[in-house]
Regions:
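Nuclease and nuclease-like effector domains acting on nucleic acids or nucleotide cofactors
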Residues: 1-102, 106-133
Length: 133
């Protein structure tokens, strides 16, 4: 996978994740019945809004999966852009195209990037499901 990563920021984040897992390994475990993806985290993490904070951020937008993901995905893209001095659009490209990752709102209360294969493989009810209840 690293051979296909040409962006230096993306490459460093992938190498950092690999090094952490090479040294410590990782275990998928559950918290309150949901998988915690922290062991597979790539790059930074950002605290996700509480239900009250999310409702305030949504304002007059419809309360649905797309509008919720728009807010949380923007949070991780903006953090990546801020940390690495890049645009939000380039951050989105780094996440999806360079790293082949998905933004994941974890049971731990943070959003971060995880490899797409893991996000699809480990069945979970994420943040969006919890917020729509």
């Amino acid at each position: 996978i690293l051979q296909r990563i040409t962006h230096p920021i993306a490459r460093q984040m992938a190498e950092d994740c690999n090094e952490r897992n090479r040294k410590d390994g990782f275990t998928m475990y559950k918290v309150d019945g949901e998988y915690c993806f922290e062991g597979l985290r790539v790059g930074p993490k950002v605290k996700i809004p509480s239900k009250e904070e999310l409702l305030a951020l949504l304002g007059n937008q419809p309360i649905n999966a797309a509008s919720i993901r728009n807010i949380t995905y923007t949070l991780i893209r903006e953090e990546l852009a801020r940390l690495y001095g890049t645009s939000v659009q380039e951050a989105a490209d780094i996440i999806g195209n360079q790293l082949d990752c998905a933004p994941h709102e974890d049971i731990s209360g943070y959003i971060f990037m995880v490899p797409n294969w893991a996000h699809k493989w480990f069945r979970h009810n994420g943040y969006v499901s919890r917020m729509l209840k």
